[in-house]
Structures are given as structure tokens and as C-alpha cells.
């Protein structure tokens, strides 16, 4: 298939990547896009951290990240992991490591399935307000320090068959990257590639990469440039997508979707996190909704419903809620609720079942494109359930 054919195809063609194992969860183009999140409890509060991890896993997070800003937090992860497993929860755990974190990362790597580092902070020097430039010699000297500091962690992760996320944040680029490339997607990409090349030199390839920013256009440019740069240099590592600090409510969800869904539609992205200033478990339905809307995963009923207009023959919003309440547990079905027969049958042609206003007070029920029966409006929802039962596709709610 040519690039032009792919552009106009109705299915998304994902960028081909290697598979990276995080515990027993596979990340990469041969596998479904993975949903993950991060607890907001203090890691030193063992009971609260364990409860947060289990709660996220039960909500559908397939990987859970925990912050480890100190050695005490890193050591606590051993107890946390044991307690999580004792509760029968097998979700893979990721440790988040930032400022000058090699010792922390070396400690916590024993207790988790993946370590996340921030290239801009991993070898951190306080910025000099009087600095005017970085010479090539100074740039290279810091690069040598990074290599020396990073190598023991890479070796440990390689030998233990653990994973690493090279997680760049637009807001925390190293001073030398800012001087050399500016506060740009190019600076983000070069920050990541410096660490990618070290891993490659040390024959470690269990890597996932993220390029997060709080503004969707910056994030989009950085991920696209990262993918192109890896392709040029012969690397095929998976991408972890996210818009950092997206906020809360409708806007936070829309902002995250604008960034994540745009890249997924381009075929980029192998695991996602929607970052909201809310309880972490509220991020999970947004992730699955993004994936389902793009046809990348199907984890819920797909409802097709018209927006309502003057032709609508019943209270469409009310009926849609009733249909959803009755059928939302039937994962895998497509159900259409359409207000009239003008557009209804055509727009819902791909649905498994249709509920369409036929005439005032009368509902037509469809199986695919075929009209099966007409029923009084007040019997419509129950008749739809009965039709699904007749087809052997009904299961009782849990």
C-alpha cells in the first residue's frame, strides 16, 4: 500500500515498532495500544499508595506509575509491590525518577517493571543566569558525564530485562539543550536521542519514548520529529503519548484528545496517558474512549445517535439514556438510536442494532440493515433487549 493509499484508507496504519515488555504487558505496534496512569498518593504512605494502584488497575489502567523522588521512596516500592501482589493485583509498576536520580533509579529498578527518567533532569546542574553560550567542548563534556552516569542504570535494566522510558518534558529541557536548540521540538528530540544512542551503544533496546508538552501543537511537532529522527537513524522504539498538565473538566479532556488522537490517527503511539487534574481513575475512560473512537480498541458498546432536529419523532436524548442504561454492559455491540427514517437507516447501516423513529409513537427496530419489527414507542427499549436476546447476544449485567 502506498503512502497515498494509506492516507485515504479508513483504517489506521500504525508505525511499525519493536515490542517492549513492561512486566507481562506488551507495548508496540503488534499489540493493542496500552492505557496507563499514575497514582497521586505519597509513595511513603504505603497503604494509600497500594490502594491507589489497585484502584487504578481495577478502573482499567494496564500500567501504573509511581513517583520516587528520594531513596526512601525508592525503597518503599519494594513493600508497595509486595502488598499490591498480595492483593492479587498483577499490574506492572513504573517508577518515576527525576533530578540527579541515578542512585534512586538503581535502587528502585529492583522493585518495578520499568523506570522512567527525564533526560533534562537526570544529570542536573543549576542553570547559570550569567551564561551567554555553551561551547562545543562544554556541551561534549556534559555529554560524557551523562554517559558515565547513565551507563550503570542501562546495564542493570538490560541484565534484569526491565524496561526504560526516556520521558522528555518540554518544560524541563537541560540548559545546554536550550542554548543549542532553543525551547523547541528539535531540542526535545535531541534530548531524547542522546539517551537513545547511549542505550543502543550498550545494546539495550527495551525502551519507550515520550515527548510531552502542555501545548498540543508543541507535543504534536515533537512526536512527529522524534518518529522521523528514529526512522532516519534506524530505531523503532514505541511511543508513549500524552499532553502533560492538560487541566481538568471538559477542556482538559478535549486538550488531551486533540494531541493524543491526532497522533494516533497518523499511526503514531503505542501507549497513552490522559493527564487530568482530577482523581487518576477518571483518566481511564477518556483513554478507552479515544481508542474506541479511532477503531484501535473496542472495550464498550459503540452508540450511534443523531443530534436531533425538527424531524425527530421522540425524545432522543431521553431514549438514548434508556438504551445506554440497558445495554452498556454488552461490550462489542454497535447500537444506533436515530430520530427518524430520513437519515436513520443509512447512517446506522454498520450498526448491529437500530432503534429508529418510524412515525409518531412508533419505533422500528433493525438488525443491521434489515427492519425486523415495529413496536409502540413505550415498548421500544424492552423490544430492543428482546431482539438482542433472540440473537443470543444478550448477557445479564454483572
Swiss-Prot record:
GO-annotated biological processes: isopentenyl diphosphate biosynthetic process, methylerythritol 4-phosphate pathway; terpenoid biosynthetic process
Cofactor binding note: Binds 1 [4Fe-4S] cluster.
| Metabolic or biological pathway | Isoprenoid biosynthesis; isopentenyl diphosphate biosynthesis via DXP pathway; isopentenyl diphosphate from 1-deoxy-D-xylulose 5-phosphate: step 5/6
Q: What is its EC number?
A: 1.17.7.1
Q: Name one GO molecular function term.
A: 4 iron, 4 sulfur cluster binding
Family listed: Belongs to the IspG family.
From the Swiss-Prot or TrEMBL record, give the protein name: 4-hydroxy-3-methylbut-2-en-1-yl diphosphate synthase (ferredoxin)
Provenance organism = Parasynechococcus marenigrum (strain WH8102)
